[in-house]
């Protein structure tokens, strides 16, 4: 995914405000052996790009002054109540160094699971992304979580994710192995089932 930015000459609160009034968003590119670079981007183009999941989880080709560099989006600052992006941070990547980043989780097949089909359970997504480490060439756009075998009362954990080759959970996620999805029967459904059982008359 390509992103076009421009070198930013002016800094400070006043300069940032003038850029916002002109439809621009400030940013910075850092990392690697090169000094941090102040940039500005078209706000509307950036706003629409930020709506795409891949913009947050993929390696981006950032073009500044005609030169392209490979980066990851690391931080976005939004206005507290206006639809406005105040600032973005990009990190340069080294193809030979492992990345520590977050990958989105795509949950699949919940509707065909025993939890839903047999028990009318509700499958909840406890987290929507997970921290991973890998080389840039192995970075997945997202990770799939297969829920087809989950049963009522069960939970899936981070280590249950089928990771692609070259991708691993970060050390602390691997150690904690947090819950990523769970299947529970709604309280009302449990009460209804119990009441139905109590109302049954034993056969003579």
Curated annotation (Swiss-Prot):
Name of the protein: Large ribosomal subunit protein bL25
Any one GO molecular function term: structural constituent of ribosome
Name of the gene this protein is made from: rplY
Record InterPro entries: Rbsml_bL25/Gln-tRNA_synth_N, Ribosomal_bL25/Gln-tRNA_synth, Ribosomal_bL25_b-dom, Ribosomal_bL25_C, Ribosomal_bL25_long, Ribosomal_L25_dom, Ribosomal_uL5_bac-type
Biological processes, Gene Ontology terms: translation
Keyword check for rRNA-binding: yes
SUPFAM superfamilies, alphabetized: Ribosomal protein L25-like
Assembly with partners or alone: Part of the 50S ribosomal subunit; part of the 5S rRNA/L5/L18/L25 subcomplex. Contacts the 5S rRNA. Binds to the 5S rRNA independently of L5 and L18.
Keyword rRNA-binding tagged: yes
Protein family per UniProt: Belongs to the bacterial ribosomal protein bL25 family. CTC subfamily.
């Amino acid at each position: 995914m390509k992103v076009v930015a421009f070198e930013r000459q002016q800094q400070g609160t006043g300069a940032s405000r003038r850029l916002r009034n002109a439809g621009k968003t400030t940013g910075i590119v850092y990392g690697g052996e090169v000094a941090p670079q102040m940039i500005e981007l078209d706000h509307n183009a950036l706003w629409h790009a930020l709506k795409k999941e891949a913009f947050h989880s993929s390696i981006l080709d950032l073009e500044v002054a005609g030169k392209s560099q490979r980066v990851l989006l690391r931080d976005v600052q939004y206005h507290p109540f206006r639809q406005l992006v105040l600032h973005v941070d990009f990190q340069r990547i080294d193809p030979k160094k492992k990345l520590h980043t977050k990958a989105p989780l795509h949950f699949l097949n919940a509707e065909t699971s025993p939890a839903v089909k047999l028990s009318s359970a509700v499958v909840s997504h406890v987290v929507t992304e997970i921290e991973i480490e890998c080389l840039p060439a192995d970075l997945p756009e997202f990770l799939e979580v297969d829920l087809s075998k989950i049963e009522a009362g069960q939970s899936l954990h981070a280590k249950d994710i089928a990771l692609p080759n070259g991708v691993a959970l970060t050390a602390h996620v691997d150690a904690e192995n947090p819950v990523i999805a769970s299947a529970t029967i709604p309280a009302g459904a449990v009460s209804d089932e119990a009441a139905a059982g109590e109302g049954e008359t034993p056969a003579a």
